[in-house]
Amino acid sequence: MQTLKVDLGERSYPIHIGEGLLDQPELLVPHIAGRQVAIISNETVAPLYLERLTRSLGQFSVISVVLPDGEAYKNWETLQLIFDGLLTARHDRRTTIIALGGGVIGDMAGFAAACYQRGVDFIQIPTTLLSQVDSSVGGKTGINHPLGKNMVGAFYQPNVVLIDTTSLNTLPSRELSAGLAEVIKYGLICDEPFLTWLEENVDRLRALDQQALTYAIERSCAAKAAVVGADERESGVRATLNLGHTFGHAIETHMGYGVWLHGEAVAAGTVMALEMSARLGWITSQERDRGIRLFQRAGLPVIPPEEMSEADFLEHMAIDKKVIDGRLRLVLLRRMGEAVVTDDYPKEVLQATLGADYRALAQLKG
C-alpha cells in the first residue's frame, strides 16, 4: 500500500492506494468519530461492494442510500434522497458519510456532507479510474444545473481517500478510457516525463495491468495533491487542472448530461485546447498531434460533436466558473508539461479553434 498526503494544515488527510483495501477497516475507523455511518452508492456499484464494506464496518450503525446511476441524476432531486435517508435514520452531527462509487457519487455525497446539519465528516472510496485520479481528491463537491455543469457546490475536504485498485477489475472499458483522459491531463499540464511513460504503457493500462494502474494512480494523485495543497480553492494554479474542461463541459451540457462521459468530453475538449495552443504558436503541430494520438490510443474521442456550432460552444462556455468579469479564461498549454490560465488571446483564434476540422486532425498517422 502507498499513502500520499494532501497537505492542508489541520485539515490534511491521507490517500491510501493499494489492492484489497476495502477489506482493511483499520484504514477507515480512525476517521469515523461517531457511531453512525451512511454509505452513499449507486445501483451499479452497490451490488458489487456495498455488503462487503458494510460488513467491514460492523462495529458501527450503518445505513445505505443507493441512488440511480449516471450523470443525468447529479441534481437536486437525487441529492434530496441522501437527506431523506439521513433524516429518516435520525443521523446526527457526528455521522460520517462515505461515498462508495464514481465521480457523481463522490460529488453528491460530499455536497450532502457539506450541507447536512452544516457539515459532517466525509470519506471518499472511489471505484472508477476517473474518480480515483481526480474527483475524489481535493474537496470539490456539487451537482449540475440544467444551464451548466458543477455550477452548484462547495469546497469540502474528505477525512481520508481509500483507493482499492482491484475495484477497477469490474469497470467497463468505456469507463476505464474515460478515466485515462484525466490521467493524460496530468502529463500534459505538469509532468512531461509521465506523458512519455503513458505513451509507452497505455496498452498495459487498458489491459488492467495492476502494476501499471497503481503507478498511474499514484503519480496522478501526487500531482493533484501537490496542486490542491498549494491552491485549495482554485484561485491560481489549481485552475490548470481544468485543461480541456471548459470545452468539455460545454459538450456535456449541450449533449445532455451522461450522453458523453465526463472523460470523453474532457478528451475532445483537450484536443480543442491543444489546437488553440498550437494556433497561438505556444506548441508545435507535432506536439498537438502527440496529444491527439495518445487520446486515440486510450480509446477516447478526439472530435467534438459535429452538431455543435461555434455559437453553441460560446453560449455554454459563457457559463463557466473560470469566467471573471465577463472574460472567458481558458486553460491552454504554454508548452508541453506547462499549462496556463489566460484570457489574453485574440477572439479570432478562439473562433478558428471552434471551427477547426477535427475530423481531418483525427486522421493523422504515426
Swiss-Prot record:
InterPro entries in the cross-refs: Dehydroquinate_synthase, DHQ_synth_AroB, DHQ_synth_fam, DHQS/DOIS_N, DHQS_C
Catalytic activity: 7-phospho-2-dehydro-3-deoxy-D-arabino-heptonate = 3-dehydroquinate + phosphate
UniProt keywords, alphabetically: Amino-acid biosynthesis, Aromatic amino acid biosynthesis, Cobalt, Cytoplasm, Lyase, Metal-binding, NAD, Nucleotide-binding, Zinc
Name of the featured protein: 3-dehydroquinate synthase
Name of encoding gene: aroB
Pathway(s) where this gene product acts: Metabolic intermediate biosynthesis; chorismate biosynthesis; chorismate from D-erythrose 4-phosphate and phosphoenolpyruvate: step 2/7
Predominant localisation class: cytoplasm
UniProt cofactor(s): Co(2+); Zn(2+); NAD(+)
Entry binding sites for NAD(+): 69-74, 103-107, 127-128, 140, 149
CDD domains: DHQS (cd08195)
GO cellular component, one term: cytoplasm
EC id: 4.2.3.4
Organism the protein comes from: Pseudomonas fluorescens (strain ATCC BAA-477 / NRRL B-23932 / Pf-5)
Family from the record: Belongs to the sugar phosphate cyclases superfamily. Dehydroquinate synthase family.
Gene3D superfamilies from the UniProt entry: 3.40.50.1970, Dehydroquinate synthase-like - alpha domain
Binding note for cofactor: Binds 1 divalent metal cation per subunit. Can use either Co(2+) or Zn(2+).
Binding sites annotated in the UniProt record for Zn(2+): E182, H245, H262
Biological processes, Gene Ontology terms: amino acid biosynthetic process; aromatic amino acid family biosynthetic process; chorismate biosynthetic process
